[in-house]
């Protein structure tokens, strides 16, 4: 199976976690896009979705799925999204698509987080994939200097402005052994909106696309 076929398999497998008459949290990226396609097949069974990006919102609406503002819901039954890396503790690096802040808000709203990935995203230690940090523009240089102190090499993601109007620093060469501590530290730097480490609130279930089919991993 190609990588895209693996992504499609886990996207459709995630439908098993969607209950009727609920509002579904929907992520961003190529794997999440397959889940949105799958969601379109049961759109008359759900109330709608809360989306983590403008791109996902457009795709949901094109399929006729109602999109709700996060401020209009108290909680979500389930949130389905991909990841750039996931470790054995179900902690993740997310934000390659620059939607990390909205993704983190939706994960906080959700009772269950289903991470959908192909097997290439599974790692023992987080950090080989550059860690995205969303930063208020005026703080970019200051935050970059603080990230260097952590041992990372921050790189400004040129030409990218988030849906919130901010910029992204991608931090290379981090070997993240204590993901909770790193998440808390970076989130405490003035000017950081959020870091793309999902460690305090990790995934509850990972659906992993492999050559042998979709494997389910739980905490």
UniProtKB/Swiss-Prot annotation:
Reactions the enzyme catalyzes: aldehydo-D-ribose 5-phosphate = D-ribulose 5-phosphate
GO terms, molecular function: ribose-5-phosphate isomerase activity
One Pfam family named in its UniProt record: Rib_5-P_isom_A
This protein's pathway: Carbohydrate degradation; pentose phosphate pathway; D-ribose 5-phosphate from D-ribulose 5-phosphate (non-oxidative stage): step 1/1
EC number from the UniProt entry: 5.3.1.6
NCBIfam families, sorted: PRK00702.1 (NF001924), rpiA (TIGR00021)
Family, similarity comment: Belongs to the ribose 5-phosphate isomerase family.
Protein name, per record: Ribose-5-phosphate isomerase A
Organism (species): Pectobacterium atrosepticum (strain SCRI 1043 / ATCC BAA-672) (Erwinia carotovora subsp. atroseptica)
Species classification: Bacteria, Pseudomonadati, Pseudomonadota, Gammaproteobacteria, Enterobacterales
